[in-house]
Regions:
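Polyanion-binding surface elements
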Residues: 1-29
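Generic recognition of long tandem-repeat/solenoid scaffolds
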Residues: 10, 42-43, 153
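Short helix-start
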Residues: 32-58
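Residues that form generic nucleotide/phosphate-binding pockets
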Residues: 51, 74, 94-98, 205, ...
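Helix-turn-helix/homeodomain-like alpha-helical modules used for DNA recognition
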Residues: 56-135, 140-142
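Glycine/acidic-rich beta-strand-loop module
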Residues: 125-154, 159-170
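C-terminal regulatory/effector modules of DNA-binding transcriptional regulators
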Residues: 156-235
Length: 235
């Protein structure tokens, strides 16, 4: 039986209705850690709300992983050598168009989502210290946000798969370890994170479910788009 709308948990049938999917798909989302099961046949309501909010970014057609990282690099004031000249020129034009759109920053979050798959894991014991050495962290200080003490960064997809097996990592939508899994050249990601102007941090924060982080990231991302359109991405 479905719970009342004000309660913290909902039955699978109600979760399927809220998500507009089948019960089997609800189970699949639970297995992927995108929503959270709290018991037999019960789903955490907040995890459903967070999932739906995240889907709002997905209304725009996503760019490929290479194009997404190309956009991040251009906004970061860095050179892009993995895209063709014509493709890079078109991407520059698209970024300028987004700069003129009041919802350009919001759309960019959706367009670049394929740069990485965000995975959250439960943290315990020694894990945080060890996994922190495996990731490419992205400083948020330019956003006026303190760098998080939690594990949050980019990691090669194959390396993450190996770590899941090695440490028995458990996925959870409310986990406090965030691993941004990408199959793109992780050394390039490292360069963008360490030598860029902060656009990557703005993009990460703009996609956050936390209201303060989302606001700071969205404002900064809009500024990065404006600076790019004005030819000041290197500033």
């Amino acid at each position: 039986m479905a719970t009342k709308s004000g309660e913290q948990f909902v039955a699978v049938e109600e979760a399927a209705r809220l998500l507009d999917v089948t019960k089997r798909h609800v189970a699949r989302l639970g297995d992927l850690g995108q929503i959270r099961y709290v018991g037999r046949g019960l789903v955490d309501r907040d995890s459903i709300a967070e999932y739906l909010q995240e889907r709002d970014f997905y209304r725009s057609r996503a760019w490929s992983e290479e194009t997404a990282w190309g956009a991040v690099a251009l906004l970061s004031g860095l050179h892009v050598d993995w895209l063709g000249q014509v493709q890079t020129s078109r991407l520059r034009g698209r970024l300028r168009e987004l700069a003129e759109n009041e919802r350009g920053a919001h759309e960019l979050v959706g367009r670049t989502r394929n740069r990485a798959r965000v995975m959250r894991y439960e943290s315990y014991g020694f894990l945080a210290a060890r996994l922190r050495k495996e990731i490419v962290p992205v400083s948020r200080r330019r956003l006026g946000l303190a760098d998080t003490k939690q594990v949050d960064g980019y990691i090669d997809t194959e390396r993450l798969a190996a770590l899941e097996v090695k440490y028995g990592l458990r996925r959870s939508p409310r986990g406090d370890m965030t691993m941004r899994s990408t199959s793109f050249d992780i050394s390039v990601v490292q360069t963008i994170a360490s030598r860029g102007n902060g656009a990557l941090a703005a993009l990460d924060a703009a996609g956050s479910m936390d209201a303060r982080e989302h606001g700071a990231g969205s404002r900064a991302l809009a500024t990065h788009l404006e600076m790019f359109a004005e030819g000041r991405a290197h500033d």
